């Protein structure tokens, strides 16, 4: 980031620096982010920008789409005994009391999880199979509005947290439409009851009946929902492909700060897109 600030006029203008004036080095930028994290100011900044969007006419409209993605972090090489201590909730200093330098480099907040993906169709037209991919890191849970595609709410958890458990944390009640789209991970009796109680209409994908084939009517209904729900995947693709979202810090507080900053940056890019669209329209 230090190099980009020195190299790009657009970055200098955005940050308010004059051409040729002193600019912050990498260490200064890191310390500034640490201060923001300690003061819990990044979430406040995210909410302030969202309020700015609303006052300029970008209200949360058309319903909301909920999803989560795994944000990778450097893998930890721990023994079985150390893994057990981490799962028991011990801090790094408690797990490695005799080696404080090692403890300072250990992330005990991130978790392993299994990510499922579909294999390519085999030769001869055989059906696809699920591939289990072990992944380590944190999860970025978000809700976007269907009309403009801005991230309206986000929550960061460890990677093993179930997606459906965070529905209530990201769904807001100020959207002008009541519809809520999500994949099957979010469908449960408790989530459905909560949505109904708060005046939301569930557009969550329906699961295949246990022990039965998925009916054509169910497939068709889920396909209709997927056309809208797929928009949230574009958000994650932007963040990972164009913003290089990856956790290199230690601990969930710093991970939350990094992910929230990326979510904020995405909203800024999205605002530029809409403003240009309006100007050319």
Report the location of each language-model feature:
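Generic, well-ordered alpha-helical scaffold segments in large soluble proteins
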Residues: 4, 8, 35, 52, ...
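Short, charged, surface-exposed secondary-structure boundary motifs
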Residues: 165-166, 190, 211-218
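Short arginine-rich
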Residues: 13-16, 268
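Polybasic low-complexity intrinsically disordered regions
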Residues: 3-7, 15-20, 24-197
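Structured core elements
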Residues: 141-143, 153-155, 181, 203, ...
């Amino acid at each position: 980031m230090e190099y980009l600030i020195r190299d790009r006029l657009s970055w200098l203008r955005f940050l308010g620096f004059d051409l040729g004036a002193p600019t912050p080095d990498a260490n200064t930028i890191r310390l500034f982010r640490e201060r923001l994290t300690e003061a819990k100011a990044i979430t406040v900044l995210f909410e302030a920008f969202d309020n700015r969007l609303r006052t300029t006419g970008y209200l949360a409209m058309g319903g909301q789409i909920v999803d989560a993605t795994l944000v990778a972090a450097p893998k930890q090489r721990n023994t079985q005994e150390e893994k057990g201590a981490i799962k028991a909730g011990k801090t790094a200093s408690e797990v490695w009391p005799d080696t404080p330098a090692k403890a300072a480099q250990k992330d005990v907040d991130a978790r392993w999880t299994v990510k499922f993906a579909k294999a390519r169709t085999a030769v001869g037209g055989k059906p696809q199979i699920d591939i289990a991919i072990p992944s380590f890191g944190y999860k970025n849970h978000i809700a976007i509005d269907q009309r403009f595609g801005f991230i309206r709410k986000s929550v960061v958890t460890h990677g093993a947290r179930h997606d459906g458990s965070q529905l209530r944390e990201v769904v807001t009640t100020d959207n002008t439409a009541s519809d809520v789209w999500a994949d099957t991970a979010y469908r449960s009796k408790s989530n459905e009851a909560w949505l109904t109680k708060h005046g939301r209409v569930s557009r969550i994908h329906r699961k295949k009946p246990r022990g039965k084939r998925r009916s054509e009517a169910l497939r068709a209904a889920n396909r209709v929902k997927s056309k809208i729900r797929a928009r949230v995947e574009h958000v994650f693709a932007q963040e990972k492909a164009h913003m290089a979202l990856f956790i290199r810090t230690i601990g969930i507080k710093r991970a939350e700060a990094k992910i929230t900053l990326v979510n904020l940056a995405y909203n800024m890019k999205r605002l530029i897109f809409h403003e240009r669209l309006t100007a050319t329209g």
